Amino acid sequence: MNWFEVALLGLVQGLTEFLPISSSAHLRIVGQFLPNAEDPGAAFTAITQLGTETAVVVYFWRDIVRIVKAWAGSLAGKVSRQDPDARMGWLVILGSLPIIVLGLLFQDQIESVLRSMWIVATMLIVFGLILAVADAVGKQERDLTQLTYKHGILYGFAQAMALIPGVSRSGGTITAGLLMGYTREAAARYSFLLAIPAVFGSGLYQLYKVVSKDGITGPYGLPETALATVIAFVVGYVIIGWFLKFVSTRSYRLFVWYRIFLGLALYLLLGFGVISA
């Protein structure tokens, strides 16, 4: 067991999950520079994301409790479905459908061919440029009370793009939000809430497979993965507050340049054979 490696990967997961730079890409990249030079694997990535998503639940627990109560009340007919919190509950469910369906349909590709470092590098650059355009041209006038069901499903398809490492779940959803005219902070908040069902679903499914039958694939076993998950939770909790404050006053330009630089650096490293695809 290499506890230093998994601690580092947990730190990376916590630092990058909520930033629009793709945590799965960073786990894939950092894995290449560790002594065993292996991909940590889709299962390791999904399970460690349980840590960062638990940080979302803890950070937003008041909002989540309020939304769940209102949504449950709307099911029972005690609360109007037009109640802002009840609507948010339905919007999160609606927005989660694309990633659930596409994740199941393309599970084999997601866990194999789509983890190619060439694809990671390309997605970092392409979606970095799209984020730059969205940040520049988005009107940034709408808040979450103006979120429509149509926009909710579009957010959902943007989130589903993050099944490809390098796209970034938060980056995809934030980009979609900006293009639809939402403020930076509103786009980020809905991105956090929207991720809860998808990330918990994926992580718990992978955990079930590990515990019940398959065993974890990749270089790290369940104890190491558990440590990485705990570290990801602690670091992720800190990052959420920082990121929301950052985007309330600053543009996403810093993340755009970082994505482009990292993507180009990966092309060079792959081209010269320093790392393998």
Curated annotation (Swiss-Prot):
Q: What does UniProt give as GO cellular component?
A: plasma membrane
Single annotated GO MF: undecaprenyl-diphosphatase activity
Q: What is its main location?
A: membrane
Q: Does the keyword Membrane apply?
A: yes
Q: Where in the cell is it found?
A: Cell membrane
Which reaction equation describes what this protein catalyses?
A: di-trans,octa-cis-undecaprenyl diphosphate + H2O = di-trans,octa-cis-undecaprenyl phosphate + phosphate + H(+)
Segments spanning the bilayer are 88-108, 117-137, 157-179, 191-211, 227-247, 255-275
InterPro entries linked: UppP
Provide the membrane topology annotation. Answer: Multi-pass membrane protein
The record's Gene Ontology biological-process terms are: cell wall organization; peptidoglycan biosynthetic process; regulation of cell shape; response to antibiotic
Q: Which UniProt keywords apply?
A: Antibiotic resistance, Cell membrane, Cell shape, Cell wall biogenesis/degradation, Hydrolase, Membrane, Peptidoglycan synthesis, Transmembrane, Transmembrane helix
Into which family does the record put it? Belongs to the UppP family.
PANTHER family xref list: UNDECAPRENYL-DIPHOSPHATASE
Q: What does this protein do?
A: Catalyzes the dephosphorylation of undecaprenyl diphosphate (UPP). Confers resistance to bacitracin.
Question: Which additional comment does the entry carry?
Answer: Bacitracin is thought to be involved in the inhibition of peptidoglycan synthesis by sequestering undecaprenyl diphosphate, thereby reducing the pool of lipid carrier available.
Q: What is this protein called?
A: Undecaprenyl-diphosphatase
> Which source organism does the UniProt entry give?
Pseudarthrobacter chlorophenolicus (strain ATCC 700700 / DSM 12829 / CIP 107037 / JCM 12360 / KCTC 9906 / NCIMB 13794 / A6) (Arthrobacter chlorophenolicus)
